[in-house]
UniProtKB/Swiss-Prot annotation:
Its EC number is 3.1.21.10. The lineage of its organism: Bacteria, Pseudomonadati, Pseudomonadota, Gammaproteobacteria, Chromatiales. It comes from Halorhodospira halophila (strain DSM 244 / SL1) (Ectothiorhodospira halophila (strain DSM 244 / SL1)). Belongs to the RuvC family. This is Crossover junction endodeoxyribonuclease RuvC. It is an enzyme of class 3 (hydrolase). It catalyses: Endonucleolytic cleavage at a junction such as a reciprocal single-stranded crossover between two homologous DNA duplexes (Holliday junction).
Amino acid sequence: MTRILGIDPGSRVTGYGIVDDGRPTRLVTEGTLRLPRQAGLAERLGRIFDGLAELIAEHRPQEVALEQVFVHRNADTALKLGHARGAALTACVQAGLPVAEYAPARIKQAIAGSGRADKTQVGYMVRALLRLRTSPAEDAADALAAALCHAHHRSAPLTAATTGARR
């Protein structure tokens, strides 16, 4: 059984979700790192790094699935998102974890059957696939979707090699 950490990076809210990939796939934990608006970017990035490093130390995932940056109309927003991803990647690399990156559309396709699925559809499918009583917060659901997408690609390596999964 492989423990997978999914991360949905954001400069204000970073979602995380950890699953054990088995039969059935099982939720370990999920949540969000909420970063104060009044904090500067450097402080928020430090909190992302520290929060994920603590989560990794506590739950000992073996692999990481990280959502790739999507093209954003606002360059400043895209740069901040890129910085948040960098803080998340650094926490994972410092822990010696292999990281697979997936495009948002690839994650949605794997979880909801459509690369254009909305957040409600993704949340519903995450809840159904993990047999949860309630839906996780949006950012945590997106992180769990990344982890589930990675679990799917792990079980179908040829598919992963041909659909854009990057390690």
